[in-house]
Structure formats: C-alpha cells, structure tokens
Amino acid sequence: MYTLRRTGVKGCIINYDKTSLIEGFDCINDFDKCNCLITNIECCPTDREISEIMDVEYCWIEGKELMRLLKKEDFQWIWGVFSVFPKNVTLDEVLKYDYPYADGYTGFWKSPISVQHPLAVSEIVAWDGMYILLIAENDESVNTFMKKNIFAKDLEEYNRELI
C-alpha cells in the first residue's frame, strides 16, 4: 500500500475575494499531472458542462481538465474539498476512505495541520464561500501561494489567534 508522509504539512487561509482557486492550483507542483477528488460540492456555475460535472456526490477529474473548467468560468464555490493525488493513485484506492469534507470539519482549525485524505498530497478547500484554504505536504506550494497573495495567512498562526 502507501506510506503516509505527514511530516511538514503546512496550510494557509485567505479570503475568497482576494484570490481564486486557479491561483491555488497554480502553486501545486505539476498539478496538471495529478488527479483531483472533489467532495462536499456546493458551487454556482452557470455553464451547463460545468454544472453537470459538479452536480454529483463526488467528482474524480484530471488536474489539467479541472484547470480548463475553472478557466472557462470563474464561478463561486460555497463548499468543496479538492484533494490532490499523484497519477499512480487510483480512484478505487481513494474511495476506500471517507470523503473529505469542509462543512462541519473542525480539523482545519487545530494544530497540527493535516491533509484529510490519507493518500492525498494536497487539499484546497472552499470554506463557506468566504475562505480558501491550501494545505499541502510540500511547504513550497503553500509558501509560493503566500508570496503571491499578501492577504494569505499561515493557517497555524491564524488558528492560534482564534484561541
């Protein structure tokens, strides 16, 4: 099976109106060569193709195809967890675990930060239409996103301020 690599997980949070999901995915190395499981889907596309793809319990999609859809229409996401997997991880393997979720998940607000799905390397989360969270095993992805977005805040620091 897989060895879980959970050391060095880092996260950041940013107001939804200060960035886009595309910017988050652009910071994940080789995202176009990954697969993505989208769960807890609540979004408002007007494009028929996108609406039909997202009107499901979960969506398994190649990173390159997801980027094409997000560039086709910049629509609002209320809830959604985008779990990113290397190409060698299959949908059958992914579905052996519970679906990641955003609405009601308290793990975002606790330290240490972790990726929900044990086989995923990164997660981007649309949270309540207000925030986007980027959580990754690769600090570089989060650091790059934070450098590009001055409004992004380290998620562990954000959580400490809530206490």
What do these predicted ranges mean?
Residues 113-163:
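Acidic, proline/glycine-rich low-complexity IDRs
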Residues 12-70:
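N-terminal interaction modules that seed assembly of large macromolecular complexes
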Residues 48-125:
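Surface-exposed, low-hydrophobicity interaction/linker segments
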Residues 5-8:
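N-terminal leader/presequence regions that precede the main folded/catalytic core
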Residues 25, 31, 75, 82-85, ...:
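Phenylalanine-focused residue identity feature
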